[in-house]
Structure formats: structure tokens, C-alpha cells
Amino acid sequence: MAIFHLDFKIVKRSEGMTSVAKAAYHARTRITDDRIGETFDFSHRTDLHGHILLAPVSAPAHIVESSSALWNEVERVERQNNGQTARYFDVAIPVELNNDDKKKLVAEYCQKNFVDKGMIADIAFHDLDSKNPHAHVMLTLKTIGPDGFGKKDRSWNDKKIMIQWRESWATMS
């Protein structure tokens, strides 16, 4: 039986967070945050079962070539010292699915609910062979176009849309 877990949070500089550090942790990799000059290395972790970036077709290729490129650009274009740089969530994946279907389910959910609305989704799959298969997803807060990031879309902060996102996952999973 699937266990429902989906909780949205924000990466906030005012809380000492950086989207680059969060991305490095999720993707179990090593990324240097160009803004602060600090390197975050989680490559020793062994529970990663795949990683993908999903982006609108209008997103410039140089921004979506890697998590490092994406989140360093997000940090670069956020001008506020106490700014918010990403939305993120963890989602429990039904254990009954095979690993390919687990990945497909999360990717389809992210495409439908976020990427098709203009966000970039950075997805890391963890512990797919365990009793706790889950994905970590980071989402951009600003619109993306051929020229790069635009303004933040404040409608994405509406509690009603977050309820819709949760309902969508409950229906799809």
C-alpha cells in the first residue's frame, strides 16, 4: 500500500540556505556555489537511483545542462540578500511499482504540474529498491524563457495551487 507524503518548502537565503547546496545533496554530487565560493560534496552517498532535469522547451540549453549550471544561474539572478531561490519537496513513491515506473510516475507528475506551467524541475530518485522509495524535487521560482529567467511567478505561492498539486499526486500515485 502506498504511503502519501508530499510537503512543499522554500530554499531561503535568510535561513542560511543555498539552492546549490540543496541540489548537490539531492543529486549526491559535488557542486561549487559560484556566488559564495563554497563547494558542497555529497558524492560519497550511495542511495541515488537516477537524476533528471525537466525544463520547458524555451529554456536556454546552457542553463539546463546540469544541476550545477541551473542552480548557480538561479543564485546569480536572485538579487535579494535574503531572497528565496527554489521550492522543493520530497515525495514517497509507491513501493509496488518497478523502478522504471517509479521514475516515470514522478517525471510525468512534474511535467504536468510544474514544467508545463513554466518551471524547471530537478529530480533525484533515492532508495528505489528499499521500503522507502522517494524522490527529491527542486523547482525554480522564476519564469524561464529563451533569454533566461524572468520574474518570480507569485501565483505559484498560492495555497490553493499547492492543494491542487497534492491532489494531483494523490490521483496519479
Residue map of PLM features:
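N-terminal nicking endonuclease/strand-transfer module with a His-rich metal-binding environment
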Residues: M1-S173
